Amino acid sequence: MNTEDRKQQDRVAFILSEFKQLKNILDNKMDYYARKLASRQERQRSLVGEYNGVCYFKPRKLTSKYGVDFFYSVICQLEKGDALGQVYVELDDGFLEIKNDGAESVLYTKHFMQRFLERMNLQSYLEDFSIERFMVAFLGTISLYKPIVFEKKLGDFSITHKDWYDACACNSEGMYCIRYVNEMYCVYKTFISKNEFKPSQMKKWEKLMSESVQDEFQEGMSTSYNQVFEARKTL
């Protein structure tokens, strides 16, 4: 083998070596992106719906004394906070921290509920009770570990775990309320038991529930998701 052939062979070996290194890099990158994509797809699978590009419905598996999995499904993404029972609410225009007591927390939650009601066109349901009372009841429905109660600020009104489970008919075998309207229905049923709703409002809720969410107490995501919101718009 002459010098030129040896040089050519060395060049080929070098190129092959470079290609192997490049292939390893690409393989590693592909593995990385494949894992990243799989992780993203898994996260996307956990986002069981969205409303107007703002409302995310993100499941959170929680262990409670009832032994159930509960799906947060409200206008914002909700995540369980620390052991103190904090609940974090993320809006499209910023991040709010909702705590279980204190005047500042009340202001935050009031702001959140005002935004919530504006987006869902539910202001009419506040005719005969304050937004603070509505806020406490609503947030109470999403607190499995303990009810959110503002007794010093809002009087003696509160909602308990038993109220929530009785209203939603959830049981220890893994049934849960997975939709915004269901959670509002829980609040609605609780308020009915406390005589907080007017008869005219009750009729509207009954109409919505009877037409839209007969099959909503089930595992997973229902195919009637869009129909639920369309039915709500007709009220």
Task: For each feature predicted by the language model, list its residue ranges.
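Ribonuclease/tRNase effector modules and their secretory precursors
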Residues: 1-235
